[in-house]
């Protein structure tokens, strides 16, 4: 068992010890599926950390978005400072997939912007999985996409060892084959340089350089050095340099793949010509032959991932190898917020196939492109060795496959109880809510209000503002950084009320919130389903005076179940507190965030500097551009305008509105050209 070193300033409390013991026994006993039903604020991440430490397995912690994955990674790194806690998410800052819109006969080429730091973290994760067992990888759903062939990636690693005799030309050739480029002037990640008897390499998975010092053909020393100062950071006896890309194809496999692609092209052209689809056949032949020429000459082409099945030597319909294939056989999967994450697994495959089908039918891609895909839900679960689902509201499927293996964790270390739930009539609900808000604001407490529609949220925000309530409105068009800033301002008391339609997805853990108001709670639907109601009620579960108000004229089944579950948890918590003499205390979570530290500096510069009004200028410029793309714009407004348009472009791509995203991309290019002069 690897030595996970769990470091924490506290020990398990409440029902954490029982939950930890039950889950550890289940994992060690071979249980394939278990569920941790943990209420908001009960320390589920700490319980996860204890289960990982006590079972000693390499672990994958799966989150349903990048932000939650980052939060989990930071927390687990604090718990395991001496172990490998890695972060694996999509490395695209912006990604617009290849698409074709038949209605308007519009082809949109793939456009992507890769974040080099995230790419480094992805390589760091796979390197750690090859070299040690005390590894925790926190990943988003992107981990179900193809990631090369682990065995080929490992086989391609170039090893250096102190005292060995090298054929240095052969080693340099291997580095080039592994997609490292030689640059004797400027060394960086994915590059190497050779000066005299010193070889320096920028590994794909490190922000440090590896320096190989030679004496003739013998390796005299291996060191990690700082790329900026040249300072020696660590001496090594041996080092493996893994490929700069996860997709590694040996020469013999590449030659076979080219032959297979040619044969598939012939078969597909026969089919298309037989169907009378001459334009599609001509298009496919031209595109594929160009790609084959590039593959034969340089081993790469744009869109090479569409030939992944042939390059990997897979059979038609077989699943791709992905991050989880880099884990050893006895790995442990922990699915955070499983009621959301599990449903995403199947959705990713379905969306991908719908887009690929159109490209294949219209001659843009060979049928084998459909096998460049994420895993199907069932394929993912076949690969999962043992799983712990974690949620305050586990889904029916998780509970079903877990059988009776459900560990309950409802007691908070702070002693805080679940909120009191009150149902009030909708007649006069806004005025009633206004009175509650004023009462909470007078005590320096915060309020969350959730409505059913965007229009209702806007109208309510306007009404509250007219009545001198400090209120903000959170909606889908607000960009990620601004969302974080709005939430931070609520915690800091810049305003008292946050109104939104779906506040669940924000992962809002706000100790200052003492009141959650749910308008139209009796309107059945996704936002008023049992699990959604429990999640929303839980937003007030970190405050000693937490209350949830449900405005409704009828008691729906979802409401009844949510209220019953909240009361059940509250009774358990109350009984525990009375038995152990615990007095509920407020959670002491500080309102700090590294991202927001940057925002504070940015805000100060805007207030103090000569460009304080740039944001307003850019806002007007954006509006003018929408009305008249050729409108004259001040150069100083362009950077902020480009940021706004990039945000819109990313939102359009997320919504699969590829035409709009492409138009925005073209506008941004024009603006950048204007800036360049």
From Swiss-Prot:
GO terms assigned for molecular function: ATP binding; ATP hydrolysis activity; DNA binding; excinuclease ABC activity
Chain location of the short sequence motif Beta-hairpin per the record: 91-114
Keyword DNA repair: yes
Function, as annotated: The UvrABC repair system catalyzes the recognition and processing of DNA lesions. A damage recognition complex composed of 2 UvrA and 2 UvrB subunits scans DNA for abnormalities. Upon binding of the UvrA(2)B(2) complex to a putative damaged site, the DNA wraps around one UvrB monomer. DNA wrap is dependent on ATP binding by UvrB and probably causes local melting of the DNA helix, facilitating insertion of UvrB beta-hairpin between the DNA strands. Then UvrB probes one DNA strand for the presence of a lesion.
A biological-process GO annotation: nucleotide-excision repair
Domain Helicase C-terminal intervals: 429-591
Locations listed in the record: Cytoplasm
Naturally occurring in which organism (per UniProt): Parasynechococcus marenigrum (strain WH8102)
Keyword field contains Manganese: no
Entry's Gene Ontology cellular component terms: cytoplasm; excinuclease repair complex
Positions with a binding annotation for ATP: 38-45
HAMAP family in UniProt: UvrB
PANTHER family the UniProt entry points to: UVRABC SYSTEM PROTEIN B
UniProt subunit comment: Forms a heterotetramer with UvrA during the search for lesions. Interacts with UvrC in an incision complex.
Domain Helicase ATP-binding: 25-412
Protein name according to UniProt: UvrABC system protein B
């Amino acid at each position: 068992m690897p030595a996970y070193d769990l470091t924490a300033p506290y020990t398990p409390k409440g029902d954490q010890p029982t939950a930890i013991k039950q889950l550890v026994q289940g994992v060690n006993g071979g249980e394939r599926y278990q569920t941790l039903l943990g209420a908001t604020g009960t320390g589920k991440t700490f319980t996860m950390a204890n289960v990982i430490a006590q079972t000693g397995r390499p672990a994958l912690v799966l989150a349903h978005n990048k932000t939650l994955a980052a939060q989990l990674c930071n927390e687990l790194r604090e718990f395991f400072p001496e172990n490998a806690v890695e972060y694996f998410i999509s490395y695209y800052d912006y990604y617009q997939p290849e698409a074709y819109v038949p209605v308007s006969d519009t082809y949109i080429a793939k456009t992507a912007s890769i974040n080099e730091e995230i790419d480094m973290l992805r390589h760091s994760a796979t390197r750690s999985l090859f070299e040690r067992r005390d590894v925790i990888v926190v990943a988003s759903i992107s981990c179900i996409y193809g990631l090369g062939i682990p065995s080929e990636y490992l086989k391609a690693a170039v090893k250096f060892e102190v005292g060995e005799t090298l054929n240095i030309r052969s080693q340099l050739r291997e580095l080039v084959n592994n997609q490292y480029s030689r640059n004797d002037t400027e060394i960086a990640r994915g590059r190497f340089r050779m000066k005299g008897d010193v070889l320096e390499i920028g590994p794909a998975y490190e922000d440090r350089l590896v320096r190989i010092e030679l004496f003739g053909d013998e390796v005299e020393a291996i060191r990690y050095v700082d790329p900026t100062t040249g300072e020696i950071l660590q001496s090594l006896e041996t080092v493996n340099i893994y490929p700069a890309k996860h997709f590694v194809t040996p020469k013999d496999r590449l030659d076979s793949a080219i032959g297979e692609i040619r044969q598939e092209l012939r078969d597909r052209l026969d089919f298309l010509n037989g169907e009378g689809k001459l334009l599609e056949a001509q298009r496919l032949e031209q595109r594929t032959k160009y790609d084959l020429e590039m593959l034969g000459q340089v081993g790469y082409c744009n869109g090479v991932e569409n030939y992944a099945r042939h390059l990997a030597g897979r059979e038609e319909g077989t699943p791709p190898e992905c991050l989880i294939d880099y884990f050893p056989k006895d790995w442990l999967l922990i699915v955070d917020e499983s009621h959301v994450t599990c449903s995403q697994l199947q959705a990713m495959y379905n969306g991908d196939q719908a887009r690929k089908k159109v490209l294949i039918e219209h001659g843009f891609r060979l049928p084998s492109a459909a096998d460049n895909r994420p895993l199907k839900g069932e394929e993912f679960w076949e690969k999962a060795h043992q799983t712990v689902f974690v949620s305050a509201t586990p889904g029916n499927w998780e509970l079903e496959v877990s059988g009776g293996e459900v560990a309950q964790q409802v007691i908070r270390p702070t002693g805080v109880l679940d909120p009191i739930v009150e149902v009030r009539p909708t007649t006069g609900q806004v005025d009633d809510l206004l009175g509650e808000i004023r009462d909470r604001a007078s005590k320096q407490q915060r309020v969350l209000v959730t409505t059913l529609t965007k229009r209702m949220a806007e109208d309510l925000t306007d009404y509250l503002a007219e009545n001198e309530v400090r209120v903000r409105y959170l909606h889908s068009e607000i960009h990620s950084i601004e969302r974080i800033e709005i939430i931070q301002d609520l915690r800091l008391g810049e305003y008292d009320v946050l109104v939104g339609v779906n506040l669940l997805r924000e992962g809002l853990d706000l100790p200052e919130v003492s009141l959650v108001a749910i308008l139209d709670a009796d309107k059945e639907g996704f936002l008023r389903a049992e699990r959604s109601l429990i999640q929303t009620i839980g937003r007030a579960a970190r405050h000693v005076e937490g209350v949830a108000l449900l405005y409704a004229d009828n008691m729906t089944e979802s409401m009844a179940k949510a209220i019953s579950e909240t009361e059940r948890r509250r009774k358990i918590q109350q009984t525990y507190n009375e038995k152990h003499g615990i007095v509920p205390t407020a959670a002491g979570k500080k309102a700090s965030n590294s991202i927001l530290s940057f925002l504070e500096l940015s805000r100060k510069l805007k207030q103090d500097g000569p460009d304080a009004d740039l944001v307003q200028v850019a806002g007007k410029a954006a509006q003018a551009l929408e009305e008249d793309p050729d409108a004259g714009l001040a150069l100083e407004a362009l950077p902020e305008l480009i940021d706004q348009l990039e945000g819109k472009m990313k939102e359009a791509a997320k919504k699969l509105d590829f035409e709009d995203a492409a138009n925005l991309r073209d506008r941004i290019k024009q603006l950048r050209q204007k800036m360049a002069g």
